[in-house]
């Protein structure tokens, strides 16, 4: 008698546990933003930025330098938004895009921070950061460059509107 009761209890526990695990996985990976892992380590990140500035000068575009890391969900979300159909079309039309891996600057393990300093951003409080540059290297969004740490929570329209406005901003 105890064996059938124990077997029933174990079966019920397995079903409940599987349901809880499935719910946890859905919650952990179910989100309302696209994701991309675009922050590869480059041997010459500054060279990548310089090349984007040169292309921007030739093509009459601006440059977006996204400074983030693949470990960061907001960095992955921002990379995903920039590759989405609507925002990606704007970026392709108006910008040269460069992703720069910066590690974990908030914990003292930052990389390529000299790139931000070159454009007048001395402190990167976290990831990601989005620098919009003119073709001659002027930082056009000094007031918002380091405010992208909530990229996963931003709405598509808000991201699009900000990038569209920066594409038109007078220098």
Question: Across the structure, where does each feature detected by a protein language model lie?
Answer:
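Electrostatic cytochrome c docking/interface patches
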Residues: 38-59
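Short active-site neighborhood of thiol/selenol oxidoreductases, capturing the structured segment around
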Residues: 59-72
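Structural micro-motif
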Residues: 62, 113-133
């Amino acid at each position: 008698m105890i064996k059938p009761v124990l077997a029933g209890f174990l079966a019920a526990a397995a079903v409940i546990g599987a349901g809880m695990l499935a719910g946890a996985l859905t919650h952990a990976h179910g989100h309302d933003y696209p994701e991309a892992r675009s922050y590869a380590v480059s041997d010459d990140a500054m060279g990548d930025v310089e090349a984007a500035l040169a292309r921007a000068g030739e093509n009459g575009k601006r440059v977006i330098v996204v400074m983030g890391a693949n470990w960061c969900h907001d960095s992955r979300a921002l990379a995903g938004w920039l590759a989405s159909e609507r925002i990606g079309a704007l970026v392709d039309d108006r910008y040269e895009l460069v992703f720069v891996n910066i590690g974990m600057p908030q914990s003292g393990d930052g990389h390529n921070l000299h790139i931000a300093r070159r454009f007048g951003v001395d402190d990167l409080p976290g990831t990601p950061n989005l620098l919009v540059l003119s073709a001659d290297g002027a930082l056009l969004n000094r007031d918002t460059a380091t405010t992208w740490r909530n990229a996963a929570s931003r709405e598509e329209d808000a991201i699009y509107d900000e990038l569209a406005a920066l594409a038109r901003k007078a220098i």
